């Protein structure tokens, strides 16, 4: 079999020659590594990976093909994909398409047959690097120039780019073996407005499972419009990019939280709640991307394994007096959760909805439900 040549170039001058397993052409972005062993389709379709080239450290990727039920959004958001080995055969009764065909259909430039261990060590030691994947006609100097010309994610507002353009209702529950995605429960007593900063579908499904009528709104929706919907709670979704430029979201969240409506944030939503409460955020060296990150609940001291995907973090040293730290990473000590002490608002940096990953932190969704019950804080 004849393979199209491909090249990954990093801004530090590192070059990796391999083969193309996706669309021809060129892509640039911030190169990060993800340590999850499974869930490559969920990772590719997670809007939080916009403008990022994802390196998967597990050596065999593509074994189970792809299928429509495992998508976390309507398309691939990752800027590119880097893997070690693409198996020649797909083995899964759920598979509808091979990974290379899927990548080609969505125009994703991807490379295989490179030393991902060497690449991961570079990213771990030097930090996330801007990079370029070139597939087809290879020009090393042009690839290096493209990598070095990428401005980086610091200061980049991507939430409004990946957000929905229209308000819509979400009624699909989580997937079950043998029955597919569950319909909404007959009784849905809680009206939740979910801000879409790049929301994953499984987050919305877990809200539906818990009896929420979910209305999804664009990232730039003013607080007044959300409050006019008279929600029982407001959810702040995950998303890509730097939270600090999202002034529209920060001001809206501040106004909503001040009304006393229960508010729950995940990932970018966590960072935005922190900023709206007076804290600051920082760019991490290489971020957290994987499904095996230990996090400790600071109240119960319980350790949970979580799914993580973020390159920015709330700076714990900048938390104001009305915000307490609730969770901390056991990998590097970074802040993983906060709660307002004067309002029913809290957030978590990781992904309690997993997809892919463990469900140890899923009870945070139940905490959100408790806040919306009549005996909760607001009522």
Swiss-Prot record:
Example GO molecular function: glutaminase activity
Origin: domain of life: Bacteria
CDD domains the record matches: GATase1_CPSase
Pathway involvement of the protein, from the record: Amino-acid biosynthesis; L-arginine biosynthesis; carbamoyl phosphate from bicarbonate: step 1/1; Pyrimidine metabolism; UMP biosynthesis via de novo pathway; (S)-dihydroorotate from bicarbonate: step 1/3
Binding positions (L-glutamine): 48, 239, 241, 268, 271, 309, 311-312
Alphabetic keyword roster: Amino-acid biosynthesis, Arginine biosynthesis, ATP-binding, Glutamine amidotransferase, Ligase, Nucleotide-binding, Pyrimidine biosynthesis
Stretches the record annotates as CPSase: 1-187
Key word ATP-binding present: yes
Main EC class the enzyme belongs to: ligase
Residue positions of the active site: 267, 351, 353
A biological-process GO annotation: L-arginine biosynthetic process
Reactions this protein catalyses: hydrogencarbonate + L-glutamine + 2 ATP + H2O = carbamoyl phosphate + L-glutamate + 2 ADP + phosphate + 2 H(+)
Keyword rRNA-binding: no
Subunit structure: Composed of two chains; the small (or glutamine) chain promotes the hydrolysis of glutamine to ammonia, which is used by the large (or ammonia) chain to synthesize carbamoyl phosphate. Tetramer of heterodimers (alpha,beta)4.
UniProt record similarity statement: Belongs to the CarA family.
HAMAP family, sorted: CPSase_S_chain
Role noted for this protein: Small subunit of the glutamine-dependent carbamoyl phosphate synthetase (CPSase). CPSase catalyzes the formation of carbamoyl phosphate from the ammonia moiety of glutamine, carbonate, and phosphate donated by ATP, constituting the first step of 2 biosynthetic pathways, one leading to arginine and/or urea and the other to pyrimidine nucleotides. The small subunit (glutamine amidotransferase) binds and cleaves glutamine to supply the large subunit with the substrate ammonia.
Protein's name according to its UniProt entry: Carbamoyl phosphate synthase small chain
Organism (species): Thioalkalivibrio sulfidiphilus (strain HL-EbGR7)
